[in-house]
Amino acid sequence: MQIYLFNTLTQNKELFEPEDQTNVKMYVCGPTVYDNPHIGNSRSVVVYDLLYRILVDIFEAKSVKYVRNITDVDDKIIERAANLGISINELTDKVTKEFHTNMKYLFCLPPTIEPKATQHIDVMIEIIEKLIKSGHAYIADDHVYFDVLLAPNYTELSNRKLEDMFESVRVENSKTKKHPQDFVLWKPAKPDEDVHMNFKSPWGLGRPGWHIECSAMSYKYLGKNFDIHGGGADLIFPHHTNEIAQSKCAFSNSTYAKYWVHNGFLTVNGEKMSKSLGNFITVRDLMDKQIKGEIVRLFLLTAHYRRPLDYNDKAIEDAKKTLDYWYRAIQNINIQKIDTLPSDFMQSLFDDMNSPLAIKIINDYAKAIFTATNEEEKQFNASNLIACANFIGLMNETPHEWFNKDVDENYINNLINERLEAKKQKNWGLADQIRNKLLNEKIILEDKPNGTTIWRKE
């Protein structure tokens, strides 16, 4: 099978043809580690985790290099550390650890390489020096700026007019810039800043601009040309636009990334997520609410990755009900490992990662189990269900673990025995009272014809 991806650069869905099938290269913008990741950040990670799984299936793990960076030098980091009264290293270490915990919770595979910006300052300086030498960058008032007007096809990714692009974002104006749109490659240290956030350079003590960081790390591990660059749609301009400009100007014959993939925005109850609106939801918030990671992952895959996605309680509850349905479908069935995943399921994912269609196909297997007339039919559908769900990072537990985790089985069994004894004594009121008590605790009882009682979580 062949995979098709929507390329933001060409505005077309294209057949993915890597430069080298034995060395498929993908770079994805990772987190800026100044605060705990929110649910919107997580959508991006889950989307490119799915793409990574697809690429590995086609080209094998040894042939796919997935680079996702950690931005650990940034103005937001300096401000946040100062507000908390802790060192920058303490903050970035803490938030990076939290990010990794969150991604494990969401069943995301680790990237092949996860470089930190602070460990690649030398590469950034090397690229900036190239840009100065070629005339694409200039020094002004201890800053180094990139001259946007000298970049060929600067607007090719956003497909917008230059003046319109800069109306949509805040441009830091400066009398030292040649043009208001020029962006910073290197900025000087401020007297009161943490020394750990500044580095020696030919232009004095300072730190890199945001955009040069990704250009440097992608070049270090993937070279001047690579296959896929991913990130959120909010990064198209200015971040990805500026990456392309500086990288193509720094390296002759560089096309930078061939395929640009961008995921859509995530809202909360129909509104943009922001701390001022009080609807800022971190992954840690969901973990603290005891919402299982699989539920959140399924929710994040329910909409096509390029479409907007709205977070709300009903959407999370619907994802939980879907997983409950799938786990209930495979209960007490002997699952067989299958060598080849169903072609319609794989085709849905190979068609620009159509995860909603893939989820529908999994759901159809669950329905088929409940309507099956023999064990062989049940086993066939259950084996396909679990294989497909596993492929997209779901159903990582047994049905027993899913329904009974964090449940006191002894407590429930004791109440069931009390109820059975009450029924023997014809104390129907007590029997109903026990059933209702467990029902209020989301435990459903089912009386069997042989006189026994089984239970499950709602």
Curated annotation (Swiss-Prot):
Compartments it resides in: Cytoplasm
Residue sites binding Zn(2+) per the record: 29, 214, 239, 243
InterPro entries in the cross-refs: Cys-tRNA-ligase, Cys-tRNA-synt_Ia_DALR, Cys-tRNA/MSH_ligase, Rossmann-like_a/b/a_fold, tRNA-synt_1_cat_dom, tRNAsynth_Ia_anticodon-bd
Database matches in CDD domains: CysRS_core (cd00672)
Entry-linked Gene3D superfamilies: Cysteine-tRNA ligase, C-terminal anti-codon recognition domain (1.20.120.1910), HUPs (3.40.50.620)
Residues bound to ATP: 275
Coiled-coil blocks: none
The keyword Ion transport appears for this protein: no
Top-level taxon of origin: Bacteria
GO biological process: cysteinyl-tRNA aminoacylation
Catalysed reaction equations from the record: tRNA(Cys) + L-cysteine + ATP = L-cysteinyl-tRNA(Cys) + AMP + diphosphate
Keyword check for Zinc: yes
Motif ('HIGH' region): 31-41
GO molecular function, a single term: ATP binding
GO (cellular component) term, any one: cytosol
Keywords in alphabetical order: Aminoacyl-tRNA synthetase, ATP-binding, Cytoplasm, Ligase, Metal-binding, Nucleotide-binding, Protein biosynthesis, Zinc
Motif ('KMSKS' region): 272-276
Requisite cofactors: Zn(2+)
Main location (coarse class): cytoplasm
Cofactor binding, per record: Binds 1 zinc ion per subunit.
EC number: 6.1.1.16
Entry similarity comment: Belongs to the class-I aminoacyl-tRNA synthetase family.
PANTHER family (alphabetical): CYSTEINE--TRNA LIGASE, CYTOPLASMIC, CYSTEINYL-TRNA SYNTHETASE
NCBIfam families registered for this protein in UniProt: cysS
Assembly, per entry: Monomer.
Entry protein name: Cysteine--tRNA ligase
Organism whose genome encodes this protein: Rickettsia bellii (strain OSU 85-389)
